[in-house]
Amino acid sequence: GQLLGAAPLYLKFNSYGEFVFDWGWAEAYRRHGQPYYPKLVSAIPYTPSTSPRLLLVADQPHPQDTAQALVDFALEESHRHRLSSIHWLFPIPAELAPLQARGFLPRIGCQFHWRNRGYRDFQDFLDAFTAKRRKNINRERRLVREAGLELRMQSGAALSESQWRTVHQLYRSTFDRLGGAATLTLPFFQEIAVTLGERLQVVLAFAEGREVAAAICLRSDSTLYGRHWGTSKNWL
């Protein structure tokens, strides 16, 4: 038959990489002698970004029916495998209807987004702040200059192999310092540098010609998503 839709799902035995914290639920299950894991999760790993989770082929006659069928099949599979729960993380608003129609409960979270309100330049952006905040921002930028740091943004594909090794070491240093596991490997970043092209952007900070800090970002047509960062020391 013809493919009309798909819903990638993960069978998970922990809650790492979701950015939705349900450890309390897992503990409640444990205290009552019930298994919380494995659970079924619809998400982009390590990416708390709202985007389609029910992938529907365009121009089909009944897309709502296809979406509902995907949700229903996931429920059937969860019952068949005796899973504790299904979690659809960060779906788009249009996907709430087929989920709530089957009893899914919405869980509301909070994120902080910066939006460009048509600023002409950086000074125009600064002018939107109070005098005190402008002073603080200018002070932070002055400290960067005084530290002798040079910032550059490059596509992931433009980085050399040695630069990617340095970027990955900086990425790992954040987890070493703050705790947690640096799950994403160097080959993973090198692979998406090729497959994503200009969509993968890396901000590099140089001191005396050497990379000392980095931020790994993903870019859509309208948005820059900061994902991972690391630094060799506290420069400011």
Question: Which residues make up each language-model segment?
Answer:
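A conserved beta-strand-loop-helix scaffold within acyl/acetyltransferase catalytic domains
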Residues: 1-36, 72-236
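Internal alpha-solenoid helical repeat scaffolds
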Residues: 31-48, 61, 66
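Long, well-ordered early-domain segments
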Residues: 8, 43, 53-55, 63-77
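Conserved aromatic-histidine-acidic binding/catalytic patches
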Residues: 42, 58, 62, 66, ...
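A short, internal acetyl-CoA/4′-phosphopantetheine-binding micro-motif in the GNAT/acyltransferase core
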Residues: 49-63, 229-236
